[in-house]
Design a protein with these regions (language model features):
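Short catalytic/ligand-binding loop motif for oxyanion handling, primarily in non-cytosolic enzymes
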Residues: 8-11, 37-39, 46-48, 97, ...
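Conserved residues at the C-terminal ends of beta-strands
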Residues: 2-4, 31, 56, 104, ...
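Glycine-rich beta-alpha loop elements in corrinoid/cobalamin-binding modules
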Residues: 1-47
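A generic structural signal for well-ordered coil/turn residues at beta-strand boundaries
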Residues: 24, 49, 82-84
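Conserved ATP/PPi-binding loop(s) of AMP-dependent carboxylate-activating enzymes
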Residues: 44-66
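Alpha-helical elements of Rossmann-like donor-binding domains used by nucleotide-donor carbohydrate transfer enzymes
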Residues: 8-11, 15, 27, 52, ...
Length: 170
């Protein structure tokens, strides 16, 4: 079980690739026999951390995992898996504690997960523009945030202005 986002994977994969004990990886839990190893959490990402994440990769010849293994992504595969929409996440974290939601477990483990973290409006708009330039058939953008409408109003307002000016799809 992985309990935080993004930056911890580098450490995990380096240990795994070198054949070292990856069960010491921060922010992961592992089952060994009847025991559960609960490693401490890395700090949650900040807005600056999120602004510095590399963009999602959605262009021809980038790699995608399919049941048959890893293969180069092409436009046909992209449309097969995503349709005509670009799927992304701008923010993570949620102030709510809904019984049906998986975030509840994250909050129980670390109450700081309630705090919404997000990159800047400029960063998410640049990400969308890059995706559209790589996949010009895109006709919509779908956000899969934990709590999109809980973002600060000023950030949503700035995003709306940038989106309207620079993105030509709904």
């Amino acid at each position: 079980m992985c309990l935080t986002h993004f930056k911890l994977w580098k450490n995990f994969f380096e240990l795994f690739r070198k054949g070292k004990d990856y069960t010491t990886s921060p922010s992961f839990w592992f089952r060994k026999g009847n025991n559960v190893i609960k490693n401490s959490n890395l700090p949650l990402m900040t807005a600056k951390d999120m602004d510095n994440l590399p963009p999602l990769l959605y262009q021809d010849d980038e790699l995608i995992y399919q049941r048959s293994g890893i293969k180069p992504l092409n436009t046909k595969d992209f449309i097969k898996y995503t349709g005509l929409s670009y799927h992304t996440v701008w923010s993570i974290g949620c102030p709510l504690h809904c019984t049906y939601c998986g975030n509840t477990k994250f909050i129980e483990y670390d109450n700081a997960y309630r705090r919404i973290r997000h990159s800047s409006p400029q960063t998410i708009v640049e990400e969308i523009k890059r995706a559209i330039s790589k996949q010009p058939h895109l006709s919509t953008v779908a956000f899969h945030d934990d709590s999109f409408l809980s973002l600060p109003y000023a950030q949503l307002e700035e995003f709306a202005k940038l989106y309207k000016a620079e993105i030509k799809i709904p």
